[in-house]
Amino acid sequence: MEVTAAMVKDLRASTDAPMMDCKKALVECNGDMEKATAWLKERGIAQSAKKADRVAAEGLVGFKIADDFSQATVVEINSETDFVAQNDGFKNLVLKTTEEIYSTSPADVESLKSTAFGSFFSEAVVKIGEKIELRRFKTIKADDETVAINGYIHSNNRIAVIVSAKCDSKKTAEALRPMLKNVAMHASAMKPKTLSYRDFDAEYVQNETIGRIETIKKENEELARLKKPLKNVPEFISMCQLTDVVLAKAEAAIKETLKAQGKPEAIWDKIVPGQLARYIDDNTTLDKELALLDQTYVLNDKLTVGAAVEAAAKEVGGTAEIVDFVRLEVGEGIEKKVDDFAAEVAAQMS
């Protein structure tokens, strides 16, 4: 019986086995789906239903960077328990997987699973005996010698970061590499979610605005009860909301206040820029928390990360800006299952 791509896809969906193993199973079993599934399970390749339902939120990250800093790769592989994550077999799997991704640059996890390495990965998982998942990875490459790349992996192998910057010259790129490692260390600690405020989803910003304003209002109710100074309630939380119209309106309001205070119009030009900058600062809290370029740089609290990189490039007579970064932290965003042992025992006794 001819084995079609659709059959392989269906078997893959029902067993979570690599594509090549699914095809081999179907060929061996003459296209019989049930027999092919059994064939995979006998060899420990197919995920059992019980194992598939378990949560893999522990694990390690892998990190590899070229000797000439032209390319770097980060990988996250999850296990169910930290005990397995510290196993030599698991550590070796992370190392091998990182090297494979670094060398072959697969498009995504599914693409890697469909290769011969996917079969190797599955066999390694069977030996380890726990649910293991290759969750995500990213490789950043330099298009030319004017792109600087560096990265950092934390000592516990649970956080890894890569940062790249576009520079005006090879000289600037080489000089900036140590700085980029510091930026990567900054990102590992400060947990930015995006490169710039421009990367925020509009709906996310809107929802965050409503939520944050409501939180501040509730906090102010308690502060008022305690007769303490109230917090400022912003109109906005991100630069992406501060359109030309919004800023013009804010500037007009500042001038109206100065006029009401009787300040001479001749000195407004000296006052307005500072107050407008304060308005922007008060209304961009989301950017300062979650956008890498707008975060306060941990090694110089007078500069943002973006400004610090520009300053470092300027010191060597060049220009530079961060254009990409990736930060992987083990288990980030995965909801861990908390077992209620008493409830489990009660259920078994009922």
From Swiss-Prot:
Give the signal sequence positions. Answer: none
> Which InterPro entries is this protein grouped with?
EF-Ts_dimer_sf, Transl_elong_EFTs/EF1B, Transl_elong_EFTs/EF1B_dimer, Transl_elong_Ts_CS, UBA-like_sf
List where in the cell it is found.
Cytoplasm
**What is a single cellular component term in the Gene Ontology annotation?**
cytoplasm
Region described as Involved in Mg(2+) ion dislocation from EF-Tu: spans on this chain: 81-84
Which Pfam families does this one have? Answer: EF_TS
Which keywords does UniProt give here? Cytoplasm, Elongation factor, Protein biosynthesis
Chief place of localization: cytoplasm
Q: Does the keyword Protein biosynthesis apply?
A: yes
CDD domains noted in UniProt: UBA_EF-Ts
User: Could you state a single Gene Ontology molecular function term?
Assistant: translation elongation factor activity
Q: Which family does it belong to?
A: Belongs to the EF-Ts family.
The name this protein carries in UniProt is Elongation factor Ts
| Lineage start | Bacteria, Pseudomonadati, Campylobacterota, Epsilonproteobacteria, Campylobacterales
